[in-house]
A protein has these predicted regions:
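N-terminus-centered regions that define maturation/targeting leaders and the start
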Residues: 354-373, 377-408
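Active-site- or binding-pocket-proximal scaffold segments within functional domains
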Residues: 1-373, 379
Length: 408
């Protein structure tokens, strides 16, 4: 009898035990794992995020540099090899760098298949997994033949390939190296070439794919890794990549206030149930989405000092609800919360139209809510003056005149 195999990969520094102000605040990965039924027809696996093991230095490297992602991928792969039988349905879920882990794991399985470890000792099994990872997944061209003691479980696809029933991820973050904001650490530790092999493209062997993306995240080092919507899909497959209200952890979970993240969780669970995931309905009933829930500020604390970059998001048009925008986004836009209104005022500027906006110096970014028509030509002009203490600045920068120490 075919069974479901559920792999859940958590985000950076995320664990089931994490708390905020003494209150439990697990991510959506933990919640999905908890509400998934475990019985003979469905097995589940959870892995905490990078940066959760070892001492302070190890945790900093794991969270900031991405050290540990490769090991997390191999651990989840080994579990799949131990539990998979031909015809089983593989579900991969993840958040943040855990989403990157899940997508990379999907690329690993798509390229190499699953090893048969049933006749090997633990030491032999881990050696085989590491070997297939290093020689079969990382290089651009994997070997065409493996040694005789390397056996692979046949999958149901042409050529014996293993298919992946579903990949569901919240706000994939693909920055494995040190964030660019941390220049010194970047020079010491970051080697982008080391991580180029990670395959996060959506393989044709993935039948169903779902990606929930955060509309309001502005941290530059948390840039999303989107799927290419033009990727070829199986005839019976499906693909949805939707934007949700909130910052990174408002979508993937991790705050004590869960109105927004519960919306992204409920969407993902409903999509997974539709393709065969088994859940406990009493636990699912505890998920309470609120489109007007608290929208947090992730660019605060130490992040306030680092580089920010708003995401390129689609316009908030009701016609896009349910396709590229979640219904939650449009509902919050239409009737915003009283304490955080308005939400993404939107205007598409037609050719020939004019609009004047106030731009303030204090915020890093001034959201305009203006969208332009693709392929059209527009003209822009700026005027006015900003004051930084007693230093006058115009659109071209500090105004010429007497040298002032504050310019340094």
């Amino acid at each position: 009898m075919a069974k479901n195999l559920i792999v859940c990969c958590d985000g950076t520094w995320n664990t089931p035990e994490q708390r905020e102000g003494g209150l439990p605040c697990p991510t959506n990965v933990v919640k999905l794992h908890n509400l998934s039924v475990e019985d003979e027809s469905q097995r589940r696996y959870y892995h905490p995020g990078v940066g959760t093991n070892g001492g302070v230095f190890d945790k900093a490297l794991g969270g900031g540099v991405g050290v540990g992602i490769s090991q997390n991928i191999k651990s989840a792969y080994e579990w799949l090899c131990r539990n998979y039988a031909t015809g089983d349905r593989i579900f991969l879920f993840g958040f943040s760098r855990g989403a990157f882990t899940a997508r990379s794991l999907g690329g690993f399985v798509a390229r190499c298949g699953l090893l048969d470890l049933s006749s090997l000792t633990d030491a032999e099994a881990w050696s085989h997994v590491a070997d297939v990872y290093d020689k079969g997944y990382r290089p651009p061209k994997p070997p065409t033949k493996w040694p005789k003691d390397y056996s692979f479980i046949p999958g149901p696809l042409v050529g014996g390939k293993v298919d992946i029933h579903m990949i569901g991820v919240w706000d994939t973050v693909g920055a494995l190296g040190v964030p660019d904001d941390l220049v010194l650490l970047d020079q010491l530790f970051d080697d982008a070439r080391k991580y180029r092999f990670h395959d996060t493209r959506l393989s044709p062997v993935v039948r169903h794919a779902r990606h929930a993306v955060a509309m309001d995240e502005v941290r530059a080092s948390f840039a999303p890794t989107l799927w290419d919507e033009g990727t070829k899909r199986p005839a019976d497959g499906s693909f949805k990549q939707q934007w949700f209200a909130g910052v990174h952890s408002d979508v993937g979970g991790g705050y004590a206030e869960t109105g927004l993240s519960d919306g992204a969780l409920k969407w993902m669970v409903d999509e997974a149930i539709a393709v065969g995931l088994k859940v406990n309905p009493a636990l699912l009933a505890q998920v309470q989405p609120n489109p007007r829930g608290v929208l947090h500020d992730s660019a605060s604390g130490v992040w306030e000092l680092l580089r920010t970059l708003p995401r390129a998001t689609p316009p908030l048009l009701p016609s896009l609800a349910g396709s590229v925008l979640s219904a939650q986004v449009i509902e919050r836009h239409t009737v915003p919360p009283l304490s955080q209104a308005p939400y993404w005022p939107t205007r598409t500027l037609s050719v020939g139209d004019e609009v004047t906006l106030d731009v303030f110096a204090r915020p890093h970014w001034n959201p305009t809510g203006i969208y332009l028509e693709a392929g059209a030509t527009y003209g822009f002009s700026a005027s006015g003056e900003w004051l930084d203490a007693d230093i006058a600045c115009g659109p071209d920068g500090p105004k010429k005149g007497v040298f002032q120490l504050g310019r340094i």
